[in-house]
């Protein structure tokens, strides 16, 4: 009678009646000799500590520029000379236009 009541309650609660019946009917068997596995040997990895860098100003930390002291500044040119740098060598001197006889 208790099993039937248990099944009804289990069905009302939304549990599987077969699982509930199997759970209540059988008692858990005592486990036989359980042996614990030996814990795995753990290896500890040591971190390599880097040497502390020299202290810098905030602006120096943010702006990493490759500056060379020996590098000289390029010659200043007019804008037209910069744009047409390669075209000057191929031009030939202009010939005077032939004037028709009057």
Swiss-Prot record:
- Which region is the signal sequence? 1-21
Renumbered residue ranges of the record's region Disordered: 22-102
Primary residence: periplasm
- The domain of life is Bacteria
* Propeptide residue interval(s): 22-58
Q: Where in the cell is it found?
A: Periplasm
Q: For this protein, what post-translational modification is recorded in UniProt?
A: Proteolytic processing gives rise to the active protein.
TM helices/strands, residue ranges: none
Task: Give the keywords, sorted.
Answer: Periplasm, Signal
Give any Gene Ontology cellular component.
periplasmic space
What is the stated purpose of this protein?
A: Required for growth and/or survival at acidic conditions.
Tell me the protein's name: Acid shock protein
């Amino acid at each position: 009678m208790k099993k039937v009541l248990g099944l009804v309650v289990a069905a009302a609660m939304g549990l599987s009646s077969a699982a509930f019946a199997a759970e209540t009917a059988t008692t858990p068997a005592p486990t036989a000799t359980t042996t614990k596995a030996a814990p795995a040997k753990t290896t500890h990895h040591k971190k390599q500590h880097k040497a502390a860098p020299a202290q810098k100003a905030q602006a120096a930390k943010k702006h990493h520029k490759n500056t060379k002291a020996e590098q000289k500044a390029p010659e200043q040119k007019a804008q037209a000379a910069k744009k047409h740098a390669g075209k000057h060598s191929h031009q030939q001197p202009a010939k005077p236009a032939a004037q028709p006889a009057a």
